[in-house]
């Protein structure tokens, strides 16, 4: 979980802003949830929370359920949102997001 990494109030606000389908924008989300202001170490901790199968990468299926890391009741991303998110983060084109790619993606926000 993100306990001790992000505040509950920031998480609630970030999730509330993207409840509608096709409204998720990763830059806005990372900024609202407070992640883009964090140190590289904290951003790496967040990566390990999202990388549920501990493969060292965030794959498409993990991206689809990205919001559920922040609240179990959150919606899944749509296919279009997932694809946009993946394209934004996957700078080497291998179809998944590594830890350095994730850090770059968060810092762009």
Curated annotation (Swiss-Prot):
Gene Ontology CC terms, in alphabetical order: cytoplasm
EF-hand domain residues: 38-73, 77-109
The reply on keyword Metal-binding is yes
Q: Modified residue N-acetylserine is at which positions?
A: 1
Q: What would be an example GO MF term here?
A: calcium ion binding
Q: What Gene3D superfamilies does its record include?
A: EF-hand
Q: Where does Ca(2+) 1 bind?
A: 51, 53, 55, 57, 59, 62
Alphabetically sorted, this entry's keywords are: Acetylation, Calcium, Metal-binding, Muscle protein, Repeat
Which residues of the sequence carry a binding annotation for Ca(2+) 2?
90, 92, 94, 96, 101
InterPro entries attached to this UniProt entry? EF-hand-dom_pair, EF_Hand_1_Ca_BS, EF_hand_dom, Parvalbumin
| Top-rank lineage group of the source organism | Eukaryota
Further notes on this entry? Three parvalbumin isotypes, in nearly equal proportion, are found in toadfish white trunk muscle whereas only one main component (IIIF) is present in the swimbladder muscle of adult specimens.
- What does this protein's UniProt record list under function? In muscle, parvalbumin is thought to be involved in relaxation after contraction. It binds two calcium ions.
Please report which protein family the annotation says this sequence is part of: Belongs to the parvalbumin family.
- Listed name of the protein: Parvalbumin beta
Species of provenance: Opsanus tau (Oyster toadfish)
């Amino acid at each position: 979980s993100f306990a001790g990494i992000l505040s509950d109030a920031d998480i609630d606000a970030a999730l509330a802003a993207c409840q509608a389908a096709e409204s998720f924008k990763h830059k806005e989300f990372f900024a609202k949830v407070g992640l883009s202001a964090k140190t590289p170490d904290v951003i790496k901790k967040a990566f390990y929370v999202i990388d549920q199968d501990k493969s060292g990468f965030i794959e498409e299926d993990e991206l689809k359920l990205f919001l559920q890391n922040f609240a179990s009741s959150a919606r899944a991303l749509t296919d279009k949102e997932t694809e946009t998110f993946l394209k934004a983060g996957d700078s080497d084109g291998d179809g998944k997001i590594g830890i350095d790619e994730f850090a770059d993606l968060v810092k762009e926000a």
